[in-house]
């Protein structure tokens, strides 16, 4: 039985802003015109699951024809990016009857008991009963079925 899982990745880049020297002062009477800035910003922002928010064409904020802040292009290219991972997967359930029948050795092999040692033991000789008591390795062709029933089994397929 196969279960579905999905992974979403979002990446955000934060540009660093450097302010110009405080040679220009802003008073409460002066107004800031942001209409051109907002239109330019809306047209340059892109957001999707595979790309990051980018605003490379941002114009500086203008105060009545006076520049007070600019975007430093050399610093913004080396700005840190923050990545958010959202992974959703379903827990696989262990098949409890299979968990009682199979074991994993220290090297990662799947082993099982031999059949035929539950009843009618009086007619079986001692040598046969001893042989049936030992564990044997599961065939490689059955590994997929056992691992499907026991998803959290630590199996080494290369051994």
Curated annotation (Swiss-Prot):
Keywords attached to this entry: Chloroplast, Plastid, Ribonucleoprotein, Ribosomal protein, Transit peptide
Organelle targeting peptide span: 1-86
Pfam family, one: Ribosomal_L35p
GO cellular component entries: chloroplast; large ribosomal subunit
SUPFAM superfamilies linked: L35p-like (SSF143034)
GO terms of molecular function: structural constituent of ribosome
Cell location: Plastid, Chloroplast
Keyword Plastid recorded: yes
Chief site of localization: plastid
GO biological process, alphabetically ordered: translation
Sections of the chain in a coiled coil: none
InterPro entries the record matches: Ribosomal_bL35, Ribosomal_bL35-like, Ribosomal_bL35_CS, Ribosomal_bL35_sf
NCBIfam families found in the cross-reference section: rpmI_bact
Function of the protein: Component of the chloroplast ribosome (chloro-ribosome), a dedicated translation machinery responsible for the synthesis of chloroplast genome-encoded proteins, including proteins of the transcription and translation machinery and components of the photosynthetic apparatus.
Sequence similarity: Belongs to the bacterial ribosomal protein bL35 family.
Assembly mode: Component of the chloroplast large ribosomal subunit (LSU). Mature 70S chloroplast ribosomes of higher plants consist of a small (30S) and a large (50S) subunit. The 30S small subunit contains 1 molecule of ribosomal RNA (16S rRNA) and 24 different proteins. The 50S large subunit contains 3 rRNA molecules (23S, 5S and 4.5S rRNA) and 33 different proteins.
Protein name listed in UniProt: Large ribosomal subunit protein bL35c
Taxonomic source organism: Spinacia oleracea (Spinach)
